[in-house]
Amino acid sequence: MADRRVGKRQMGQRGFSKVESGTCNVCSAPCSSCMHRNVGFTGSKLDESSDENCHGVVGSQCSVNEDDLLPSSMVNAHKSLNNTASEASNLVNSSHDALSENAESKETIRCSGISDDSGAAAMTSKPSLSGSRMKHKVSASANMLDQSSNCIEDQEDGILSADRAKQLKSGCSNNEIGNKDLADGSALNSDPIPGGSRKDEVKLESLQNPSSNHDDRVSSEKGNFKEKSRPGGNKERQEPSVEGSTRSGENRKDGKSSKSSSSNSSAVSESESDDSEMVEHDVKVCDICGDAGREDLLAICSGCSDGAEHTYCMREMLDEVPEGDWLCEECAEEAEKQKQEAKRKRETEVTFNTYSSGKRHADKIEAAPDAKRQVVEASTGSPKKSILPRVGALSRETSFKGLDRLRGKLNHQTSFSDDTESARSAGSQLQPPKGAFLKSSSFNCSSSKPKVQLMDDAIHPRQKTGKEDTALDLKVGGFRNVGKSMPSRTTDAGNSGGSDSQAKMLGSKVYHSQEGKSLKQVKDRNREANASASSIDQKLKSRGNSSVSHANNNRDLKGLQSDGKRGNLTKQVSNLSRNRLENSVVSGGDISTNEKCSASEQSSSQADCKDELPSTSCTGEGMPNHGTVALQDGLPRSRVPREVGKKSKEAFSKRQRSSLLAGAKGLPSSQKGGQTAESSDTSGVSDSDLSTTKNVKEDLNKGNRLRAAVDAALRKKPSFGKNRVLEQSDASLVANVDSSSEKTLRNQLPSKMHKNHVSHEGLQGGHPILWPTSDPYKQTIVTNEKQLIFPGADTIPSRLVEPEVSFPAVKPVMRDLPLVPSPVMLRSSAIPDHEFIWQGDLEVRKIINQSAMHSGIQAHLSTLASPRVAEVVNKFPETFSLNEVPRKSTWPTQFEKLGTKEAHIALFFFAKDTESYERNYKPLVDNMIKNDLALKGNLDNVDLLIFASNQLPSNCQRWNMLYFLWGVFQGRKETNPQKNTSLPTSNVLPRDRDPKELCQTSSPSKHLEKGSSLRESSSNGIETRNGTDARSHENPNNRESSIERSPSKKEDIALKVEEAGVNHIPPQVTGSNSGDSLVRKVQKVEEQELGGRKDLPLTVMGSGIQSHGQDNPLEKDLNSSQASHRKRPLWELSNPANENSSAINQKVELNNDGLCEGSPNKKLKTENGSSSLCRDTSGHDSGIMKKSPKVVFPLDLNDDSEMVDNLSPLGNDENNNNRRLISGTVPNLELALGAEETTEATMGLLPFLSRSSNSGEQSNNSMNKEKQKADEEEEDDAEVAASLSLSLSFPGTEERKNVNTPLFLFRDLPR
């Protein structure tokens, strides 16, 4: 009945086969009676398999339909293919006759006879079938008919059929040898036959395993037979040839032509191996990447001919192909485990036989093994070796064919065990063969590229294990991508067993064709598990899937055998492997601990997880588990000895990363607050692991607490500055990295911390501080960034960092944590507070004297901002006035040198809503980016600088994919309020030049002496104040005192750059200096623009100059003409000061105020101003600064009279002469070198350089002329000022234009 059922199935699959009656070309006997079925069947290996799958029914159907269906063209084609064609036709004819004679007997006998005949015929007829798949089908059908006829004849005359079977073997082998090349070519071309898809698949399988095509055929026939005999019909689809072999075995069992079938199958396998061999030799594919890649870097395994790996794909990359013998990973492991493999194979056979006995009749089971053994024996003589055991691995048969001939018997036995195993578990076998068969068939369709396609499917088997499809119940029958799950070279049972790494990467259930492998692996795993786990049987407590974990302690093959279900067996296998790895699992939900595998077996465990239960989630695959299971595959088992330690480590690190990331995506931690990794629910954790975990936890707590205490203490110190915070926090983080790398993850901490423990960032020194919400010692263990949670009572209330990440409970210690990217927000990243700290309007005053109102702007405090930022921002008015200035003018020097960072951001400015963004915010940002502008405002002595985010590093230029505005605060550079800050500093002497020297440049030596004495008395304190002010712009006292000035004055003092030519006039300012109690009034007067300059009459009232202690107030009416900050003012003293002290002291103070300018040009101009100042004094006091016969220069200007004579005309012709002298004179540098000066040149010098000490009239004239000349000079210099304007602002708000050219002379003077 089983045969008939099989036959019917095969008929359903191959009802199209056609056969023509004829005589055997070898023995001239009817094909039905002759066993020589070399007719074109060799070309159709697929036909064999399909015929085998459809043996009984096909035979009957063929007898019915062969005459009608078989086109003559096919017969002709067979004939044209030499003996194979004629034999095929003869076989078809004879088989047709025999079938017509005994249709029913054919059905019964057909299974064995057809399988045998088809095997032989397929071997012989491969070339003809390669010509056309129709031919293959016809030949297959003919073979089936012949087989059926042979079976009938055998029934009539069993001896004759046996003899003919022997003859057929010899004839087929001869024909195959003769037509080997033709068969190969025909095999390549045999795909077009529509009905021969299975045939092609079979062929491809055989081709893939050329070394043992014979064995493959036998094993496949056996497997098919088992499948057919078993209720599952998938086996028939998978490998008809296997079914044929099994049927042949059954026939033998029944006493029917078993010998002939075995011989035929062996012959067919040989021919198939021949045909496939050619194709296989053409392609060498890397087992790892699945591509030919660089052939010069492709290392070929010397142990197994099919093993190949690129040097750059190897676990340990090599620079060049190794010389001499090189063993692939599988072969290397096989060498160590050959003995174990043999034992496993025997046990596997027993197990599978026992298991399959429940599903098949005992006699059939025995017959199948016998047939398999016979076929194996016949196939052992197969001359060809499988070059593509990987491809063969897709099919049970071929998976074992990659073994060396030395292991050929073992392989055959393995295949037999696999066949019995498949017969035992029809569903399981059908599925793996299905996946394999489908792949193999697809590859066979393109026989020229079987390996390449297979490799494509099996690309990176080790890497793809983590990406394999989620668990598919093999019983359900879902097709698995075997190529992905299985390593390309695990085709051999020995290879698969030997290479545990690849087998591990493969699910233990990857193939039931490879279940022998899995059993072997299980056995190895059991042994290793026994060694590593030290007889610790850990029960898996998966609440949802008891069946998955019910085989917790079943490490014996007996338990596996007793278990009648393959799923349970595979589960047991996975459990055993897991037990060996001692992976801890949190019980809960549907999560099975089986999914947890050591790093070395992550792949296999993943496959197991996928195959075992759909409900189980494989965290190794990057899929989040139900909160109970922490990173299952991410648990390093360093103590577990593995041959593949490095591989497992690499895979583990990858899996760890993926699992951590997956877990970080929202895996809720189901553990309770007090629950740790050692909870009773955790299974598979060894005592050593538990102790290690405890120790690590203790160390972690101690180290973190210590660090937290130290950091908190440091933070409390006032000197704990921003930079120190950075350095210390960085150092602590680094230290944390070392310690936390061996600390457990959040699963060791209460889940309460996981959920509630959010990293908070306080603003201390501009850097974030992580705060625990409750317990200061509860610290979030960040995998990559070891962030300390600083418990401190003095810190600012923390703000939540977005987003909040909850880690999955991880068991046990994650030693590779440093490799895992931290999903927590980095401490150094600046994030705007969710709540805005200020909301209002920005009034932007543009450079072109226009203003624009931008409403709906709100400021958000940065998480890295200093606490003082909040204080300042709280004082922001609702409408904040800002100046639009070029960015470069306000760009801090720190940014120029070091660049900008996220940590520099103090405020984020955003629009409050979409409408405000479109109307106001976006245009403002675009304009600033386009024109490289910045916004500058000041408040409370602090400048607010706002820039566009395009100036930030590229990784933080956008927020929500949009550019934004960010602000920083900068202390304003101000003069000391104790100084005469109300007066323009542009009118004073440079601070870095000694007033004595300045006097020397403009007065005789005696006057210098007098001036020196006055300076010593008056400027000691003043200079000291000035010097202090030069270095104390950041002094808070300075800021506070400067705040007393009017806001407009503040703006003038601010460090903003004014465009050249823009006149900045100080408003009326009243200031008081605590030091000298000098009170000055600067009255703003009408501006007079003369070529860009302004004349400001300034009235200065002073009482009690500080140094001299003089209480007489000074009232000075000063005419300051200026066009820019550089413009030299002309001072006019309205009241005669005290002869020596008042006037000179006043001059000194003014000069001292100019120090902050720090520019030579300014210095020179202030000297002019000071000279004019002194000239305004009366009597001897004013004469101090006048020109005398003795000059300051190294040269001696003796012609004072001449100079005076020349100066006198200035008073007569002020306009003409003055202009002529000023415009025509250039600085005569020869004067500094001691050369004679001409009248013109001397006059060109400032008037204070030429003064006669003898003539008071001349001094008065020179004073008047100097005033006029100064006015003229200012007018002329207004044009030159713009190019030399400095980008500095001073307490004096006036802008001075370029220096007079004659003043360059002073630069060369010695000092």
From Swiss-Prot:
Residues 411-431, 487-502, 529-552, 569-607, 668-694, 977-988, 1014-1025, 1250-1263 have a biased composition (Polar residues). Residues 258-270, 1280-1289 have a biased composition (Low complexity). Residues 328-348, 1256-1276 form a coiled coil. Disruption phenotype: No obvious developmental defects. The double mutant aipp2-1 paipp2-1 exhibits multiple developmental defects, such as a dwarfed size, early flowering, small leaves and poor fertility. Abnormally up-regulated expression of many genes localized at H3K27me3 and low-methylated H3K4 enriched loci associated with a higher accumulation of activated RNA polymerase II phosphorylated at 'Ser-5' (Ser5P-Pol II) in the double mutant aipp2-1 paipp2-1. Plants missing all PHD finger-containing proteins (e.g. It comes from the Eukaryota. The keyword Metal-binding applies. The keyword Ion transport does not apply. PROSITE patterns: ZF_PHD_2. Residues 1-21, 114-141, 178-280, 369-390, 411-440, 460-701, 975-1050, 1059-1078, 1087-1138, 1152-1186, 1249-1311 are annotated as: Disordered. Disulfide bonds: none annotated. Changing D306K: Lost binding to unmodified histone H3 lysine 4 (H3K4me0). Keywords: Coiled coil, Metal-binding, Transcription, Transcription regulation, Zinc, Zinc-finger. Residues 213-240, 460-472, 512-528, 553-566, 640-653, 1026-1050, 1087-1096 have a biased composition (Basic and acidic residues). Zn(2+) 1 binds at C286, C289, H310, C313. Together with AIPP2 and AIPP3/BDT1, cooperates to form a BAH-PHD bivalent histone reader complex able to read histone H3 lysine 27 trimethylation (H3K27me3) and low-methylated H3K4 histone marks in order to regulate transcription, especially to prevent early flowering; promotes AIPP3/BDT1 binding to H3K27me3. CPL2 is subsequently recruited to form a BAH-PHD-CPL2 complex (BPC) in order to silence several H3K27me3 and low-methylated H3K4 enriched loci, including AGO5, via the phosphorylation state-dependent inhibition of Pol II release from the transcriptional start site (e.g. The PHD domain (283-334) recognizes specifically unmodified histone H3 lysine 4 (H3K4me0), binding affinity being inversely proportional to H3K4 methylation level. Part of the BAH-PHD bivalent histone reader complex that contains AIPP2, PAIPP2 and AIPP3/BDT1; the BAH-PHD module associates with CPL2 to form the BAH-PHD-CPL2 complex (BPC) for transcriptional repression. Binds directly to AIPP3/BDT1 and CPL2, but not to AIPP2. This is Protein PARALOG OF AIPP2.
